Amino acid sequence: MERECEKSVVVAVVTEPRFTQRYRDYLEKQKLLDRQYRVEKLRDGTVALPVLAETLSEHHLQELKNRVAPGSTCKLTQLLDPLPSKKARVCSPAQRLCLEVRRWVEDRGVTWSTELEADLPRSWQRHGDLMLLSEDCFQATQWKRLEPELWETVASALGVQRLAKRGRVLPDGTRTPTVTLLLGDHGWVEHVDNGIRYKFDVTQCMFSFGNITEKLRVASLSCAGEVLVDLYAGIGYFTLPFLVHAGAAFVHACEWNPHAVVALRKNLEINGVADRCQIHFGDNRKLKLSNTADRVNLGLIPSSEEGWPIACQVLRKDVGGILHIHQNVESFSGKNPQPPGSSNMEKKHWPHPQKITTDKQGNRTTGSCMGEMSSASKPEWQRWAESAESQIASLLHQVHGKPWRTRILHVHPVKSYAPHVDHIVLDLECRPCPLVG
């Protein structure tokens, strides 16, 4: 889970106040409660308990809802800038870093200044014994004269053995990170999410911390006997939950970043599912696969639209299937939803998971996919979903030469960005129309 000393975003379990103590007792016993942050009361009167997302699983959520506190509403949310606990306020990681670096710098005869203090890391991600620093730190010229010993001091203050510093993601289609290794001899790290092991090289591959709720949702799906095509597999963010927890019979994983493919192969092996997955290396728009998938995952943002034609191509011709379409949607009032052109955005608080569903009369309504919801889905989400549904129906007709019917099952928020941009997932059911006559 991402740890930041400023503008932190943490996952929290939300329930009613009367169930808070039972939830707290269970989470503490399971070592899931994040003691760095305080339990918070939300605007709608519910209570959010910060948790360690890297060890939280769908099983724990079901335990809370069905055994620990029957009748409770158990939902996930994310908290922006959560309040630190009393214990954490004694000396925060940021304060400890500042104190130790300042002491070390002054011992070497360098005058400490407000410029140097402002140039310390504002955020970081912990990857086991490696800390990945934000790109906007250690830019002052004075630091250069203190390398490489400086990095040993920083690592010691943060309690790690290795250090790296991230830069901007390259606009090369493969989302290659520009990460510099400052201390250590390699960038390979391991994460465990929901019982799934992910290994990757932070200098070559991205890891999507903010997608934990979507990975948990995917893991809870019932995909027994199904064939899935994951058009943007990466290191296995969604391929692995579909295989390990959702029970997919087989996955075709498409990826064109060679470094991500190396990590994906490792992750399939260490999770014991390599025999149920075929990797298709290269541009998925040239994929020869067709008439195969019961389900297609299109996990690319800001838009997966370039993959829509191939998604239609790989669906089974006899019964069709379900598309999981990721998209960033702008939510400006009075504007048609458009995918944003930049991913250089700052995370904000995001709402609880929701859905748009279609009733028997064809009227679309909003509701909950994980218990009752406290806020309505945004109209821009619904307008984009309807537009995507129409385009997919047209593509299906073109690809298969006959009409198909489509139906919006759910629209789920994953996370929100500033300004006014939401990462959402549309679950779209696609079925061939029965022959008449």
Swiss-Prot record:
Residues 331-344 have a biased composition (Polar residues). It is an enzyme of class 2 (transferase). Pathway: tRNA modification; wybutosine-tRNA(Phe) biosynthesis. One of its GO terms (cellular component) is cytoplasm. The keyword tRNA processing applies. InterPro entries: MeTrfase_TRM5/TYW2 (IPR030382), SAM-dependent_MTases_sf (IPR029063), TRM5-TYW2-like_MTfase (IPR056743), TRM5/TYW2-like_N (IPR056744), TYW2_N (IPR056745). It comes from the Eukaryota. Pfam families: TRM5-TYW2_MTfase, TYW2_N, TYW2_N_2. Disulfide bonds: none annotated. It catalyses: 4-demethylwyosine(37) in tRNA(Phe) + S-adenosyl-L-methionine = 4-demethyl-7-[(3S)-3-amino-3-carboxypropyl]wyosine(37) in tRNA(Phe) + S-methyl-5'-thioadenosine + H(+). S-adenosyl-L-methionine binds at S208, K215, E255, D283, N284. The keyword Metal-binding does not apply. Residues 331-374 are annotated as: Disordered. Its EC number is 2.5.1.114. PROSITE patterns: SAM_MT_TRM5_TYW2. Belongs to the class I-like SAM-binding methyltransferase superfamily. TRM5/TYW2 family. S-adenosyl-L-methionine-dependent transferase that acts as a component of the wybutosine biosynthesis pathway. Wybutosine is a hyper modified guanosine with a tricyclic base found at the 3'-position adjacent to the anticodon of eukaryotic phenylalanine tRNA. This is tRNA wybutosine-synthesizing protein 2 homolog. It comes from Rattus norvegicus (Rat).
